[in-house]
A protein has these predicted regions:
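Charged, terminal alpha-helix-loop-beta segments
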Residues: 1-196
Length: 196
């Protein structure tokens, strides 16, 4: 049964690789949270979808809402996930010979996630003030993850791959994961469960 569900998830991915609706992907990940778990090395669950993490001013504006607030099951520490779409451009045009810059969409999403984390850390105590011990969560340097783009489709030559990997590995505080890599992990899980 579990393998069949994972195969349906992979079918949806195959049918929607070109789907540029962020709302579609948000709903899909929320309904199939096992997918989001593939980007972590330890078990997690969704604590909140579009959860308020702080930032409101006196006029009740400016609140910050990442796509997902995740919680590590054992430690109850948190992580923030922001999603874009598989069609989100990873790189801009060639900057110099053999060098590409990260796209405006990716750099903007990184700034967005870091702002969410900053507000979350500043407002943490007011957010958990009335929580019981069983409801309490922690914000000990919460991990930030951005899911965007499709490396297999976009990074078609070694210069683009190298530029992206250099930008990704030097992105302080935000882990960038492409959609194709997330679903590759689901595919690997299916193979393991089927004994392949």
């Amino acid at each position: 049964m579990a393998v069949d569900n994972l195969k349906k998830i992979l079918e949806t991915w195959d049918d929607n690789k070109d789907n540029s609706s962020e709302e579609f992907w948000h709903k899909f990940f929320e309904e199939n949270s096992v997918i989001l778990g593939q980007v972590f090395s330890i078990p997690v669950t969704i604590l909140g979808s579009k959860a308020y993490v702080g930032g409101k001013k006196l006029d009740n504006k400016g609140g910050k809402y990442p796509d997902y607030l995740m919680i590590y099951k054992q430690t109850r520490n948190t992580a923030l996930i922001e999603i874009k779409t598989p069609k989100t451009q990873l790189l801009s045009s060639e900057y110099r010979s053999e060098v590409y810059t990260i796209s405006r969409e990716i750099s903007g999403a990184i700034s967005q996630l870091l702002t969410y984390r900053d507000k979350f850390l500043k407002d943490y105590y007011s957010l958990v003030h009335n929580s019981s011990d069983t409801e309490r969560f922690y914000a000990s340097n919460p991990q930030c993850i951005l899911i965007a783009g499709n490396a297999k489709q976009e990074l078609c030559d070694s210069d683009k791959k190298q530029s992206f990997e250099l930008c990704r590995s030097n992105s302080q505080g935000v882990q960038i994961v492409t959609y194709d890599k997330v679903f590759e992990k689901v595919h690997t899980l299916v193979n393991l469960l089927e004994g392949k």
